[in-house]
Amino acid sequence: MAIAESFRLEDGFSVYAGVRATRDAVVEDAAFAVAKLGGADGTDAAEKIVAALIRPDVSIIMLDGCIVSFYNWIDGEALYAKFQKPVACYVFEEPEGRVEEAVRKLFPDWPDRLRAIEKLGSPTPYYTKAGYKIYVRSWGIDPIYAGKAAELAMKLGKMPEPLRVARIMAAGARALLNTLGLRLVNGH
């Protein structure tokens, strides 16, 4: 299973898309949710998607980042505790080191937000056989095995195919909402 998001700051919300895929990355089902930009509901949005897609044969929940939606976040540990499936959060670019500075500057609730983000832990670098470097946080699975799981699902470049498809679907859903002129109230 894979969850990714798409947002534009002017929208005020982020669209999350999730896919359930087979081991060879064939997509079987999809689900969507929304979260507020700069909100604290990223984990809730991810939980809705997992609840809609979960089956006993799901072996891992892949996340396209944990710090999402303009400093919202997805708590991988909470997903692991709730669904009892390994969770891996991947970052495909060098993580930026200014999260703390930005959070302090932008959010009145910065102490709580920073605690939640710091609880995610530091990512572990993983090097693929093709020479890509990805960063992994994981719960219920060793980060190296989570990196191997990502590598096994890579078809085009360094992103696992289910995450790539989920990202495309999230962007498409966001574009559809904008094309239809739909505005979400309070991020929902």
Curated annotation (Swiss-Prot):
It holds the Pfam family DUF99. Transmembrane segments: none annotated. InterPro entries: Endo_dU. Belongs to the UPF0215 family. This is UPF0215 protein Pars_0148. It comes from Pyrobaculum arsenaticum (strain DSM 13514 / JCM 11321 / PZ6).
